[in-house]
Design a protein with these regions (language model features):
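N-terminal mature-domain "stem" immediately C-terminal to a signal peptide or N-terminal signal-anchor/transmembrane
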Residues: 74-122
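Short, contiguous, well-structured surface segments enriched in hydrophobic/aromatic residues
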Residues: 159-162, 173-178
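Amphipathic interfacial helices
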Residues: 145-146, 156-164
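Sec-dependent bacterial lipoprotein signal peptides
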Residues: 1-9, 14, 18, 25-54
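Flexible, low-complexity segments enriched for small/polar residues
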Residues: 86, 90-93, 134, 173, ...
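Active-site substrate-binding loop specific to GH73 endo-beta-N-acetylglucosaminidase modules
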Residues: 105-108, 117, 129-133, 143-151, ...
């Protein structure tokens, strides 16, 4: 956790204790004397907050000195260690595996990234839903199948960098299935996620066009079938998409320098746009409609929206200092070109991608280096996401071991990423293709997050969120993922993972064969879990505590290997060291 993040997330002093920024996290253990996997993994709700929030006392907000070069500072160590490889994979995949660690060591960082760029998508979400029979009349008003295809791709598909970037984009360019007011909504939302994944290594301008003509986005942000102004009734075009496209997807509320800092005039932030810009841009996004009226199959939700001239505004529209006229797709293209050319887009998008992959509080120099690559990939191309991804992941602030000790480095690991990290370690699969994790967005029983299920365009957490009245906010830092972190969600997470670690769910049973082979040696067992699951970030105190818990189960006890592995896994998953991605 960021040292400043140790102020907690809405926890009272009684919950978080007295731990300071320099204190090692404590791992209270109350496993009881029962035998069997489930019994050995019992951690009650009273313990969970202590496990996860014990290290959330006050903390300072210092900073780590960073290079000020205007171009990315690439770290190329003579040899990559297994720990460094695992840390890299924590930023670039949905979870490390032993095999991938070895591949990164062999191919090195940039070689591994290039290999991932070259991988085709094995199966689209849309095609998987079709192949598994979800395109039947019984599912016309259903979400059935959506969660299954999402979990499957995140956990087992080999294009792990694409999956990670796609989920980062879904956190930024939000569509949630519950707000998609279409039939066949599982197909419509799957088609949207496919757009993000298909364009994850493309150009951001192309991606802007693809989401603008996507049916699920059109429904979610209410511009599908948006009508031009009606002089008789006074009705005006829906402004939702025009506003969120600028505010959340491209530019932000305030004018930015290339390093992401806000431009001011006399101390007052300069706004990027005003109400007139929103109204003008909304006139452009009229007329976009479904390509077909056939609703007996989901096919029309995969097709790009088309222009319905009868409801499209063909008069002039002024926004961001530009005026377009004539309507149609030409006006849409010019509007998107205008936004894409705005100086804000490079730092705005770059900073959010850094936050999703590497650290919640990147230095201005880091943001500036990545933004410069967004603005120009070195060959005159703007918005080249491959170049931006490399700039983020190969920068010294991402790769240097110094980041491990910086007081503002790192981020709270998203709940979904915690589950997928365990699932990939445990070789989770579903022979039936049911992928029974389902919707995990419940704060009281699951993860408080489920990809593609945000209830709002503002996502489960905002990029600028800081827990109020904490060391984080006092230090001027942010911790987005803390917006869904509280006593209830912490307990729910530990309890949910307890069941999964012990038993899996449905036909998804964990394969711990690699770990049970080490179960009799607590040092070897915890070292392996520390490396693959936690990227070597468990402190010596945490390792000692987990080993003690493991050794409380005698090696000759009933189900000893299973119980020892389960204890080590659950306590790692519950430790602040794992919950922090550095």
């Amino acid at each position: 956790m960021l040292d400043a993040e140790r102020a907690g997330a809405g926890a009272s002093p009684e919950d978080v204790g007295e731990a300071g920024a320099g204190d090692a996290p404590t791992l209270p253990i109350a496993l009881g004397g029962e035998t069997g996997a489930s019994a050995a993994l019992k951690i009650g709700s009273a313990i969970a907050p202590a496990v996860l929030l014990a290290a959330c006392g006050g903390g300072g907000g210092g900073s780590t000195p960073t290079p000020t070069a205007s171009t990315p500072v690439v770290v190329t160590p003579a040899a990559i260690t297994a720990t460094q490889a695992s840390r890299f994979l924590a930023q670039t995949t949905m979870g490390a595996t032993r095999a991938m660690i070895d591949t990164v060591i062999s191919r090195r960082y940039e070689g591994w990234i290039d290999d991932q760029f070259a991988l085709p998508r094995a199966t689209s979400h849309w095609d998987w839903l079709n192949a598994n029979g979800y395109n039947v009349a019984a599912n016309i008003n259903s979400e059935t199948g959506f969660d299954a295809t999402m979990w499957r791709q995140m956990i087992v598909e080999p294009d792990q960098l694409r999956q990670r970037i796609g989920m980062a984009l879904l956190d930024m360019l939000v569509v949630g299935i519950g707000g998609v007011n279409l039939n066949w909504k599982q197909f419509a939302t799957a088609a949207y996620v496919d757009v993000l994944l298909d364009n994850a290594f493309g150009n951001y301008r192309t991606l802007m066009g693809a989401i603008t003509t996507n049916a699920a986005m059109g429904s979610f942000l209410t511009f599908l079938g948006n009508r031009k102004a009606n002089a008789s009734t006074g009705a005006q075009p829906d402004e939702n998409y025009a506003r969120e496209l600028m505010q959340l997807f491209t530019l932000g509320l305030y004018q930015l320098n290339m390093d992401g800092s806000v431009k001011t005039n006399g101390g007052t932030p300069l706004e990027t746009y005003g109400p007139a810009d929103v109204s003008g841009l909304a006139r452009v996004f009229t007329g976009l409609s479904l390509a077909s009226n056939v609703n007996t199959t989901p096919d029309r939700y995969r097709q790009p929206l088309v222009m319905n001239a009868s409801i499209n505004e063909t008069g002039s529209a002024t926004f961001l200092g530009t005026t377009v006229s004539g309507g149609g797709t030409a006006a849409v293209d010019k509007a998107l070109d205008t936004i894409f050319a705005h100086p804000n887009i490079a730092p705005f998008v770059s900073k959010q991608l850094i936050q999703r992959l590497v650290t919640s509080n990147p230095s201005p120099a880091y943001v500036g280096r990545v933004a410069s690559v967004f603005a120009n990939n070195g060959s005159g191309t703007r918005g080249d996401l491959k170049a931006v991804i490399k700039a983020i992941l190969l920068d010294t602030e991402a790769r240097s071991d110094d980041a491990l000790t910086g007081t503002t480095a790192g981020k709270l690991r998203e709940p979904v990423m915690r589950l997928t990290a365990w699932a990939r370690l445990a070789k989770i699969n579903s022979a039936s293709n049911a992928w029974a994790f389902g919707d995990t967005s419940s704060q009281s029983t699951r993860l408080a997050q489920s990809m593609g299920r945000s209830g709002s365009v503002f996502n489960f957490f905002r990029p600028g969120y800081a827990p109020p009245a904490t060391g984080i906010s006092n230090a001027g830092l942010v911790a987005p993922e803390f917006q869904i972190t509280n006593e209830q969600s912490v307990v729910a997470y530990v309890n949910y993972m307890q069941g999964l670690v012990a038993n899996g769910t449905g036909d998804m049973k964990p394969d711990y064969s690699d770990l049970t082979a080490k179960a009799s040696d607590s040092a070897a067992l915890v070292d392996e879990i520390n490396l693959v699951l936690a990227a070597g970030q468990l402190s010596s105190a945490t390792v000692t505590a987990i080993r003690a818990a493991v050794d409380s189960v005698a090696t000759n006890a009933t189900n000893a290997a299973t119980n020892r592995v389960g204890i080590a896994l659950l306590l790692t998953l519950a430790s602040p060291d794992f919950l922090t991605q550095r």
